[in-house]
């Protein structure tokens, strides 16, 4: 638990450092339950206190509800109460999101991550009604995922304030990156705030975020924990040093995308989770060599 400089709200529901975990597949492209359990145990034993399953990095668009729930149950059996399990329950279909939320709750999820409906481009009232409907489907706390590059439509500040009044909306995963606007919203809404973009993890802590939901955490879980701990304890110079150390991984993620980065990087570390499903593709040999270089620079290979 945070006791220093970082914000405390949301820790009991969502933890501090989460990894948006990949969904492992075997050589035939089928769900690999054992690999998922192994990866979850590895991340938790290296400082991660929360796992997001069936999110964007978990290839939610190309996995079935049955696969999502099977992985959630298996990871729950593996890690127990040693980490919070946040289940992705966001689609651009409100009824489908409700179904996913209820199934995840029954399977043992601790919380839900619900993204702004993508592709449909709903109005702000539509966004509010979507989140309200999903939030009333279970008694699990919800982290609202604001990511305009994927959803096109952002969650407007007024809408966030309305969402904050709903009993089960407890947090925001911010991949919008407008720290200036969010600084006011953090204070006004009382919601727990989580960085949803690895380049901004440290800056977000400085304005009141509780933690971050990371992709590069697959490859550098201990470094992320060390950066968080040093910031929390007031060792800002060390926190900045670690943040700079992570920069090559951030650059690699920008080049490859989160799924391809995480799966290829884990393979280089000896943790096999298979290749992505189409339309995501694995990196080329030259891209893997560039990734190897970046991982060596970061000290995680």
Swiss-Prot record:
Annotated positions binding pyruvate: 57, 213
One BP term from GO: lysine biosynthetic process via diaminopimelate
GO molecular function: 4-hydroxy-tetrahydrodipicolinate synthase activity
Keywords: Amino-acid biosynthesis, Cytoplasm, Diaminopimelate biosynthesis, Lyase, Lysine biosynthesis, Schiff base
Annotated site, Part of a proton relay during catalysis, chain positions: 56, 119
Catalytically driven reaction(s): L-aspartate 4-semialdehyde + pyruvate = (2S,4S)-4-hydroxy-2,3,4,5-tetrahydrodipicolinate + H2O + H(+)
Pathway: Amino-acid biosynthesis; L-lysine biosynthesis via DAP pathway; (S)-tetrahydrodipicolinate from L-aspartate: step 3/4
Top-level division of the source organism's lineage: Bacteria
Matching SMART domains: DHDPS
Cellular compartments annotated: Cytoplasm
Gene Ontology cellular component list: cytosol
Active-site residue numbers: 145, 173
Top-rank EC class of the record's enzyme: lyase
Record EC number: 4.3.3.7
CDD domains: DHDPS
Matches recorded under HAMAP family: DapA
Entry's family note: Belongs to the DapA family.
Function: Catalyzes the condensation of (S)-aspartate-beta-semialdehyde [(S)-ASA] and pyruvate to 4-hydroxy-tetrahydrodipicolinate (HTPA).
Protein name: 4-hydroxy-tetrahydrodipicolinate synthase
